[in-house]
From Swiss-Prot:
Interacts with PABPC1. Found in a complex with PABPC1 and LARP1. Interacts with ELAV1, MOV10 and UPF1; the interactions increase in presence of RNA. Binds to ribosomes. Interacts with GSPT1. Inhibits programmed -1 ribosomal frameshifting (-1PRF) of a variety of mRNAs from viruses and cellular genes. Interacts with the -1PRF signal of target mRNA and translating ribosomes and causes premature translation termination at the frameshifting site. May exhibit antiviral activity. One of its GO terms (biological process) is regulation of translational termination. The lineage of its organism: Eukaryota, Metazoa, Chordata, Craniata, Vertebrata. InterPro entries: SHFL. It comes from Rattus norvegicus. The gene is Shfl. This is Shiftless antiviral inhibitor of ribosomal frameshifting protein homolog. It comes from the Eukaryota.
């Protein structure tokens, strides 16, 4: 039972990161329960728009509310949390930044050799991949020492830096 709660929490955080924190934790939890942690179904329901009736059901879902105080003091839950602590601590900063909508991003250059197309894209720092718009292949970024086209100009008159 507690393992299901941990998996649900991971799914909720993944969903919120996928939608850049625009989905509230309560709504994400209710949708994950409703669709059985099926990210495709949840994504479709969010994209196509949740019906007004379903929105009222989601806001009234008692399971999506914050856990009661006695649950926070439960020894079984504490034991599971302790056993999963190394995994959680390694990802805690990333999850907190995703929740605060502060996912670190970097500007990277991508190049497609098959269609001779080059583009720049701002991507999350932990997931630096992009898809070519012409041939739809996924590419890793060009290595930092091989990038071209990035420059910075310091204007001596207005003292503004242009990138």
């Amino acid at each position: 039972m507690a393992q299901d709660g941990v998996e649900l929490e991971k799914s909720v955080r993944r969903l919120r990161e996928k939608f850049h924190g625009k989905v509230s934790p309560k709504k994400a939890g209710a949708l994950m329960r409703k669709f059985g942690s099926d990210h495709t179904g949840v994504g479709r329901s969010i994209v196509y728009g949740v019906k007004q009736k379903d929105g009222q059901e989601l806001s009234n879902d008692l399971d999506a509310q914050d856990p009661p105080e006695d649950m926070k003091q439960d020894q079984d839950i504490q034991a599971v949390a302790t056993s999963l602590l190394p995994l959680t601590q390694a990802n805690l900063r990333m999850f907190q930044r995703a929740q605060d909508d502060l996912i670190p991003a970097v500007d990277r250059q991508f190049a497609c050799s098959s269609c001779d197309h080059v583009w720049w894209r701002r991507v999350p720092q932990r997931k630096e991949v992009s898809r070519c718009r012409k041939c739809r292949k996924r590419y890793e970024p060009v290595p930092n020492d091989k990038m071209w086209g990035l420059a910075e100009f310091h204007c001596p008159k207005c003292r503004h830096n242009f990138r």
